[in-house]
């Protein structure tokens, strides 16, 4: 038993004994140029903790959301020991990805820091109560499990309008 914010921090920026979430992604390996393990880590963190689906944006600008290919790669690059080259539909673009968190208002990742420090920064940004996105995502998932439908639907598209913003804010 531990507070949720500590649990999330340990999953995203793991100590040796809690590396399963991030390291567990590596068993699949690199699927194709757009689905490197770093991109898979970014997709998982975005979906689980932020309620965002980056799968389309990992290959091309998303058709189902406003997320862009460069944003998905910049987020994936936080998880990478080397600078990722952006691939559009498995074809190299010749552009190198930056390193940025998906929501700039949460803070700025030190692009020059080593991977472990970037993951610590990311974890710290995600759990801060200032933005509350992590907690809204959690509340929405629990509500959906208990009530059969989320306050925001689908639960992996937290950019959609909630049917009750006041309730979501209060619960989070």
Where are these regions (language model features)?
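Short, structured secondary-structure elements
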Residues: 1-109, 119-123, 131-172
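Glycine-rich phosphate/pyrophosphate-binding loop
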Residues: 112-115
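Cell-envelope and extracellular/periplasmic
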Residues: 127
């Amino acid at each position: 038993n531990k507070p949720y914010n500590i649990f999330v921090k340990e999953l995203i920026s793991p100590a040796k004994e809690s590396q399963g979430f991030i390291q567990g992604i590596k068993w699949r390996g690199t699927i194709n140029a757009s689905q490197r393990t770093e991109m898979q880590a970014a997709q998982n963190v975005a979906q689980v903790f932020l309620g965002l689906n980056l799968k389309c944006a990992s290959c091309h600008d998303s058709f189902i959301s406003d997320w862009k290919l460069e944003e998905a790669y910049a987020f994936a690059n936080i998880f990478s020991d080397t600078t990722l080259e952006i691939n559009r539909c498995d074809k190299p673009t010749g552009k190198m990805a930056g390193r940025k968190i998906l929501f700039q208002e949460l803070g700025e990742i030190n692009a020059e820091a080593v991977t472990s420090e970037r993951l610590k920064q990311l974890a710290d940004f995600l759990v801060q109560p200032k933005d509350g996105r992590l907690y809204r995502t959690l509340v929405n998932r629990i509500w959906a499990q208990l009530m059969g439908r989320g306050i925001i639907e689908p639960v992996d598209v937290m950019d959609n309008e909630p049917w009750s913003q006041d309730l979501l804010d209060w619960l989070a």
